[in-house]
Amino acid sequence: MKRSMYAGRVREEHIGQEITLKGWVGRRRDLGGLIFIDLRDREGIMQLVINPEKVSAEVMATAESLRSEFVIEVTGQVAAREQANDKLPTGAVELNVTALIVLNTAKTTPFEIKDGIEANDDTRLRYRYLDLRRPEMLENLKLRAKVTHSIRNYLDELEFIDVETPFLSKSTPEGARDYLVPSRVNKGHFYALPQSPQITKQLLMNAGFDRYYQIVKCFRDEDLRGDRQPEFTQVDLETSFLTEQEIQDITEGLIARVMKETKGIEVTLPFPRMKYDDAMALYGSDKPDTRFDMLLQDLTEVVKGVDFKVFSEAPAVKAIVVKGAADNYSRKDIDKMTEVAKQYGAKGLAWVKVVDGELNGPVAKFLTSIQAELTTALSLEDKDLVLFVADTLEVANATLGALRGRIAKELGLIDNDKFNFLWVVDWPMFEWSEEEGRYMSAHHPFTLPQEETAHELEGDLAKVRAIAYDIVLNGYELGGGSLRINQKDLQERMFKALGFSAEEANDQFGFLLEAMDYGFPPHGGLAIGLDRFVMLLAGEENIREVIAFPKNNKASDPMTQAPSTVALKQLEELSLQVEEDETSKTN
């Protein structure tokens, strides 16, 4: 029979109606001769009642055979429950079953189909189709669908045009590693899966599309963590003739629409703006979490005269004050934080506690002469814990920024119901790579430099500033964008500053440079990480929880066993050979 409605949508207004439902057996209970079944579908759970006095012996026998995750079809009359269940939207009603058909049976599942399970991640991914039956996973993906629907409606209203760009593209330097796809037709040549549609969307501006968007898959072969995947989805925008402020206004409107339509939250516009240098100086991060205080304090000048060379001779000395936390952290706890500090390049972590108005701790004796100055500079009170890092400014900022976030989580200082958006602006154009031994693009090599610093492309690259902007939410980079270069000579200067010869630039980006000979308009855009945005809206800590079929931390899919080896014939068609590493040879 045709399904009448979703099980999770049956309500009191349906009492007395005969309906047909289809779904999965969530739970079966035998009570006083009656059989109760929780029928589950994507919209929720509906209680079924099978009464032996009101059904045939065949229906009763079928009901007794039911097990968890059997797929069934039931017909019956909706009735009011004697005792309502306030925890369920369907809790005021039940279905008195008159007909029951088993559509399919099921083996015992490797974990219960319910929220809050303790199965490990690889087991969940191995049986992802079962994991996705769990209500919280269904809700996460329904939220994702609502977010994308809201985004599309908003951008359509603003006359953005949805254009698909190629997945098989050209491998270019300056970024994460590419996923390469060998060409069978062009032996020895490779496509790359795009890390973003950056160049193609710029070319669409040259083509006159004016406002482009796409909700698009992107690919990066990089080390994974909780908020990264090898394939991810971004909301990609590009516009012509708009200023930085106008692009940010559009983005804020998009986010405000999504927040209102999916979470019922009215966000305050415009979002705060913070310069990159201020974010690093005060929060130790280019994606500051502004839901709590504990700002970084610069004590370099204050400690210059102390008889402690670690402080007095350091390029920078910075500190954070953990208010009232002196008793929360033992020496052993601080030793653990010291190990964290070393991961960020710090040589160590100095600390003092304020106890009865005096400084206590390993370095307290060196600070006695400046206790009054420290107390004033840091607004110290009894029971405060002060953590110091003496190192380069970059190391001090990064270390204390990381500890700031860690401590806030440990002490419960973060209001998880807050959504604090802000723009980080006025970025450096380049960042120094120790691994490469050279300056690299902080964003990408197509970013427009600020006019007043562009002359430093042939001078001190550290002084070049970009017309770039990142949108940050609760300590996560939600997205980023910039105005782009549209003048050929400036683009060539940018490539040269990055160490490209004219031949290398032409080989890698000749098609873009050629396009700049044909009236390339001023343009700029932005991309928002959809997975990360939905993760934060859903209150999750890992983007795997909002992606239907993600990879694990080894970039593998335990369900399909991808990536996998392929037949020798397929490799031969591609003129490829796989060399065994030493580990493979010994196993």
From Swiss-Prot:
Residues the record lists as binding L-aspartate: E174, R220, H443, R484
GO BP, one annotated term: aspartyl-tRNA aminoacylation
PROSITE patterns in the cross-refs: AA_TRNA_LIGASE_II (PS50862)
Gene Ontology CC: cytoplasm
One Pfam family of this chain: tRNA_anti-codon
EC number: 6.1.1.12
Region annotation (Aspartate) ranges: 198-201
Main location: cytoplasm
Annotated keywords: Aminoacyl-tRNA synthetase, ATP-binding, Cytoplasm, Ligase, Nucleotide-binding, Protein biosynthesis
Catalyzed reactions: tRNA(Asp) + L-aspartate + ATP = L-aspartyl-tRNA(Asp) + AMP + diphosphate
Subcellular location: Cytoplasm
Binding site for ATP: R220, D221, E222, Q229, E477, G529, L530, D531, R532
InterPro entries cross-referenced by the UniProt entry: Aa-tRNA-synt_II (IPR004364), aa-tRNA-synth_II (IPR006195), aa-tRNA-synth_II/BPL/LPL (IPR045864), Asp-tRNA-ligase_1 (IPR004524), Asp-tRNA-ligase_1_N (IPR047089), Asp/Asn-tRNA-synth_IIb (IPR002312), AspRS_core (IPR047090), GAD-like_sf (IPR004115)
Gene Ontology molecular function: aspartate-tRNA ligase activity; ATP binding; catalytic activity, acting on a protein; nucleic acid binding; transferase activity
Subunit structure: Homodimer.
Family per record: Belongs to the class-II aminoacyl-tRNA synthetase family. Type 1 subfamily.
Function: Catalyzes the attachment of L-aspartate to tRNA(Asp) in a two-step reaction: L-aspartate is first activated by ATP to form Asp-AMP and then transferred to the acceptor end of tRNA(Asp).
Protein name: Aspartate--tRNA ligase
Source organism per UniProt: Streptococcus pneumoniae (strain Hungary19A-6)
Lineage: Bacteria, Bacillati, Bacillota, Bacilli, Lactobacillales
